From Swiss-Prot:
Annotated heme binding sites: 284, 307
Cofactor binding, per record: Binds 1 FAD.
BP term (GO), one: nitric oxide biosynthetic process
Cofactor(s) it depends on: FAD; heme; Mo-molybdopterin
GO MF annotation, one: molybdenum ion binding
EC number: 1.7.1.1
Official protein name in the record: Nitrate reductase [NADH] 1
UniProt domain FAD-binding FR-type: residue ranges: 361-473
Length: 621
C-alpha cells in the first residue's frame, strides 16, 4: 500500500494482499493465528477436530504458496439461452474462458469435453508473453468453436488445462477441511428449454455465481423448464444451374465442412456444393491464404464477387458432393444473456483486447472517419476499428479484403494499408480512383475505388483478412508460402498502387534501425510524375537512409520537362533493372507488385537474365 507497493507474482492472493501501517522483521516464522489456521490444504481424512487434536495446522508441507492448475468457462455465461434455429445451427458457437497455473508455469493446453471426458477438443490459447525470466504470471485466455447441434446433444461442457510440468485437473472435487484449492474440471450444465413460444433453446447453468450471489447447478436453487424436442429437420440444399456440375452423390453437413479448414484439408461451399481445394492451394494465383481464409465455410457470395466464369468452371474439378442444410422453420434471434452475470464477466472480456483481424474468416465493421484528397484521383481514407484500443493485426506484407454491397452485389478488392502496423484504433488506405470514361479498355472505371470515393464520412465498410502468401517478420526474414526465407538485399519492383506492400515493408525496415540491415532497391513505375504515390515519403527516407533505401522512378511520359526529370522515361527494361537493383544471389530476394503485363513481360524475363532463381527468389504480391 501507499507509499510503497510490492507486487510478488505467484504468491497466492489471500495470503499476500495486505494494507500495512508497519512492517516488523523477525528472525523466525510468524506465530499469528491466521498464518497457521488459514490458507492450507490438509489431507481429505482430516476434519477440524482432528486437525486441532493432532496439530495438522502447524505442518509446513500443507501451506499454500503457489496456485495449482485451474481453468474456467466464461462463455456461455450462467443463464445464457442459445436458440436452436436455422440461423444459429449454420454457424459455430465460440466457447471462451481462461486458465492459469502457479509458480509462473506456462499453460500449455486447454481442452474441452462435451461427452463427459470420453473425447477432448484442444482449444486455441491466447497467452500473454512471458517475463524476461520466462515466467507466465497472467491468465491464459482460450477459445473453441463448437457446433450448436453438438451442444444440443451434450449434457454438460467441461474444461481442463495442462501446464508445462504436465499437471492437469482432477475430474472430481477433492474435499478438504478449508475447502481450498479446488481445481476439478469446471462444468457448465446444458438443458433444453422453451425461451419463446414454438421455439427451443439451450440454457447454460454454471456451478455457482461470483461473489455472494446465489444460484448455479451446485446449489440446485433453480428449476428450468425443459422440453422434449428434436433438432430441426434436415433437408438437402438445392443445386444451382450456373456450374456444369458432375454427378457426385456424397452429402455433407456444415459441421463436417468446418472440420476441413487447414492447409492439410481445405474445403469450401459454393452455391450448395462442397469442394475440396486442398490440391489447388499451391497453384492459386493469389496464394494459399486466398483459399484458407474461407476454408471450412460457405463462401458463395465472396467467390462470386471476385472470380470470373473461367474460375467458376475450374472450381468444378474439385467438387466432392453437396451440402445438407437444416430447415428454416425457426427465427434468427440472437442469444439471450443473463444480465446480472454479464456485469461480473465484463472485466474478464475486456482484459485482453484481441487484434481486429483475430479471425480471418470474420468480417469486421469499420467506420470511415477521415477522407483526404491528395490529388485529382488519389484519396487517403482513415477507417476506425471496432474498438478504439485495438490494432488492426495485419502482418507486414499481407493485405485485407475491403467488402461492400454495390448495386446489390458483393464487391471485394484487396488493399494494403499504409498506416503503421501498431496504429491503435484505426488504419489508413491510400487509394487511386479509376473514374469512368478515362481508360478505353475500362470504360466503367473501378467499381470499388469509385464507391469508396463516393462514401461520406460516417459510412461503414466491411474488412476481412489477413490474407496473402508473404509476411515480413523483421531483419531480413520472410515467411513465403509457409517457408522461411532470409535476404540481406531486396529488389522491389512495382507499378502504380502496387507500391503499398513495398511501402509497408520499407516502413518496417526503417523503423527498426539500426538493427535491421536489409538493403532495399526500389524501382517504381507510373504513367507520369503526378501519378507517383507516396513520393514525398519515399524521397525523404531515401535521403535519410541512403545505405538502406535507394529509389528509382520510371514514367511513361514527362508532363513538366522544364522541371528537369532526372529518372527514367519509358518502360522497366533490363538496363534499368541492372543499374538499379542488385544481381540475383542466395541473399537477394525480388518482390514485385503491379499489373500482370508488367510482371509477365517487363519484370520476370529481365530478372531471369540477372541470375535470379525465379522459383525461390522471386515473389509476386
Amino acid at each position: 500500500g501507499f507509499p510503497v507497493r510490492v507486487i510478488i507474482p505467484g504468491c497466492i492472493g489471500g495470503r499476500m494482499v495486505k494494507w500495512l501501517k508497519r512492517i516488523i522483521v523477525t528472525p523466525a516464522e510468524s506465530d499469528n493465528y491466521y498464518h497457521f489456521k488459514d490458507n492450507r490444504v490438509l489431507p481429505s481424512h482430516v476434519d477440524a477436530e482432528l486437525a486441532n487434536a493432532e496439530a495438522w495446522w502447524y505442518k509446513p508441507e500443507y501451506i499454500i504458496n503457489e496456485l495449482n492448475i485451474n481453468s474456467v468457462i466464461t462463455t456461455p455465461c450462467h443463464d445464457e439461452i442459445l436458440p436452436i434455429n436455422a440461423f444459429t445451427t449454420q454457424r459455430p458457437y465460440t466457447l471462451k474462458g481462461y486458465a492459469y497455473s502457479g509458480g509462473g508455469k506456462k499453460v500449455t493446453r486447454v481442452e474441452v469435453t462435451l461427452d463427459g471426458g470420453e473425447t477432448w477438443l484442444v482449444c486455441t490459447d491466447h497467452p500473454e508473453k512471458p517475463t524476461k525470466y520466462g515466467k507466465y504470471w497472467c491468465w491464459c485466455f482460450w477459445s473453441l468453436e463448437v457446433e450448436v447441434l453438438d451442444l444440443l446433444s451434450a449434457k454438460e461442457i467441461a474444461v481442463r488445462a495442462w501446464d508445462e510440468s504436465l499437471n492437469t485437473q482432477p475430474e472430481k472435487l477433492i474435499w478438504n477441511v478449508m475447502g481450498m484449492m479446488n481445481n476439478c474440471w469446471f462444468r457448465v450444465k446444458t438443458n433444453v428449454c422453451k425461451p419463446h413460444k414454438g421455439e427451443i433453446g439451450i440454457v447454460f447453468d454454471h456451478p455457482t455465481l461470483p461473489g455472494n450471489e446465489s444460484g448455479g447447478w451446485m446449489a440446485k436453487e433453480k428449476h428450468l423448464e425443459t422440453a422434449e424436442a428434436a433438432a430441426p429437420g434436415l433437408k438437402r440444399s438445392t443445386s444451382t444451374p450456373f456450374m456444369n456440375t458432375t454427378d457426385v452423390g456424397k452429402e455433407f453437413t456444415m459441421s463436417e465442412v468446418r472440420k476441413h479448414a487447414s492447409q492439410e484439408s481445405a474445403w469450401i461451399v459454393v452455391h450448395g456444393h462442397v469442394y475440396d481445394c486442398t490440391k489447388f492451394l499451391k497453384d492459386h494465383p493469389g496464394g494459399a491464404d486466398s483459399i484458407l481464409i474461407n476454408a471450412g465455410t460457405d463462401c458463395t457470395e465472396e467467390f462470386d464477387a471476385i472470380h470470373s466464369d473461367k474460375a467458376k468452371a475450374l472450381l468444378d474439378t474439385y467438387r466432392i458432393g453437396e451440402l445438407i442444410t437444416t430447415g428454416t422453420g425457426y427465427s434468427s434471434d440472437n442469444s439471450v444473456h443473463g444480465g446480472s452475470v454479464l456485469s461480473h464477466l465484463a472485466p474478464i472480456r475486456r482484459a485482453v483486447r484481441a487484434p481486429a483481424l483475430s479471425n480471418p474468416r470474420e468480417k469486421i465493421h469499420c467506420r470511415l472517419v477521415g477522407k483526404k484528397e491528395l490529388s485529382r484521383d488519389v484519396r487517403l481514407f482513415r477507417f476506425s476499428l471496432p474498438s478504439p484500443d485495438q490494432v488492426l493485426g495485419l502482418p507486414i506484407g499481407k493485405h485485407i479484403f475491403v467488402c461492400a454491397s454495390i448495386e446489390g452485389k458483393l464487391c471485394m478488392r484487396a488493399y494494403t494499408p499504409t498506416s503503421m502496423v501498431d496504429e491503435i484504433g484505426h488504419f489508413d488506405l491510400l487509394v487511386k480512383v479509376y473514374f469512368k470514361n478515362e481508360h478505353p479498355k475500362f470504360p466503367n472505371g473501378g467499381l470499388m475505388t469509385q464507391y469508396l470515393d463516393s462514401l461520406p464520412v460516417g459510412s461503414y465498410i466491411d474488412v476481412k483478412g489477413p490474407l496473402g502468401h508473404v509476411e515480413y517478420t523483421g531483419r531480413g526474414s520472410f515467411v513465403i508460402n509457409g517457408k522461411q526465407r532470409h535476404a540481406s538485399r531486396l529488389a522491389m519492383i512495382c507499378g502504380g498502387s502496387g507500391i503499398t506492400p513495398m511501402y509497408q515493408i520499407i516502413q518496417a525496415v526503417l523503423r527498426d534501425q539500426p538493427e535491421d540491415h536489409t538493403e532495399m532497391h526500389l524501382v517504381y513505375a507510373n504513367r507520369t510524375e503526378d501519378d507517383i504515390l507516396l513520393r514525398d515519403e519515399l524521397d525523404r527516407w531515401a535521403a535519410e537512409y541512403p545505405d538502406r533505401l535507394k529509389v528509382w522512378y520510371v514514367i511513361d511520359q514527362v508532363k513538366r520537362p522544364e522541371e528537369g526529370w532526372k529518372y527514367s522515361v519509358g518502360f522497366v527494361t533490363e538496363a534499368v533493372l541492372r543499374e538499379h537493383v542488385p544481381e540475383g544471389g542466395d541473399d537477394t530476394l525480388a518482390l514485385a507488385c503491379g499489373p500482370p503485363p508488367m510482371i509477365q513481360f517487363a519484370i520476370s524475363p529481365n530478372l531471369e537474365k540477372m541470375k535470379y532463381d525465379m522459383a525461390n527468389s522471386f515473389v509476386v504480391f
